[in-house]
Each structure stands twice: as structure tokens, then as C-alpha cells.
């Protein structure tokens, strides 16, 4: 199984010396987990921040086994708010909600659109009223 899609990084965990297991929410495939080889390298670890929009190439031999991601950054959204603790906490909580509530490998474009709108709202001045 091989596909490409736009996604948001919703979580990441160290897997081995130089790899990570990432969980992403894609536009057409829903929540998917995969291994990113070299995910801890200086070259790509800086843009593997939770909440960033990425382009994902997913490969797996079997739908029941974990696959492998090759990724490219589309929009570095989280670094825009590194100096604003409230917005970073908001991003973290929103991505954790998606991680906990979304079903694995089930497409849900409404959630993807809501994540897009969430980052649009976060850029506005009255973001906290719209978020709540």
C-alpha cells in the first residue's frame, strides 16, 4: 500500500537511536501511525513539531502492519507561536484531542477542515473567544 497526502503531525515518540514513530492526521486517510527513519537527525527534527502541516508519502507491505513515512514540510505553523505559551498549550491540547478521539485509518475530512480553521483562528487577535 502506497499513497501521498497532506497531514498534520499530531504526536511523535522516539523509536530507536535515529527514528521516531509519528502519528499524523491526513486529509484523505484519517489518523495514521508510521516510522520516520532519521527523524531525530539535525536535518529534519526541527520541523517535526506537533501541529506542523506536512506532506506525507506512506509505504507499507501490509495494511495490518505499521508503515514508513517520507515527509516534507508544507507549513511550519507551531514555530510561529514559540513565544506565546497560551497558544502553544492550545495547539498541544487540540492535537491531543484529535489523537484521542479520531479513529485509526478512517477518513474524516471534516476534522481536517476543522484543524485548518483552528490554525486560522489562532492567528487572529480574538482567538481565545473563538476557540472556546
What are these regions (language model features)?
Residues 1-20, 25-132:
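Non-catalytic alpha-helical scaffolds and adjoining flexible linkers that form interface surfaces
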Amino acid at each position: 500500500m502506497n499513497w501521498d497526502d497532506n497531514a498534520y503531525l499530531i504526536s511523535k515518540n522516539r523509536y530507536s537511536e535515529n527514528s521516531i514513530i509519528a502519528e499524523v492526521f491526513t486529509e484523505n486517510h484519517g489518523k495514521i501511525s508510521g516510522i520516520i527513519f532519521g527523524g531525530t537527525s539535525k536535518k529534519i527534527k526541527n520541523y517535526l513539531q506537533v501541529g506542523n502541516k506536512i506532506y506525507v508519502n506512506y509505504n507499507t507491505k501490509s495494511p495490518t502492519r505499521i508503515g514508513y513515512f517520507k515527509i516534507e514540510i508544507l507549513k511550519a505553523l507551531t514555530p510561529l507561536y514559540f513565544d506565546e505559551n497560551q497558544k502553544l498549550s492550545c495547539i498541544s491540547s487540540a492535537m491531543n484531542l484529535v489523537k484521542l478521539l479520531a479513529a485509526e485509518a478512517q477518513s474524516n475530512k471534516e476534522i481536517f477542515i476543522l484543524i485548518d480553521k483552528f490554525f486560522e483562528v489562532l492567528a487572529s487577535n480574538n482567538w481565545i473567544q473563538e476557540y472556546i
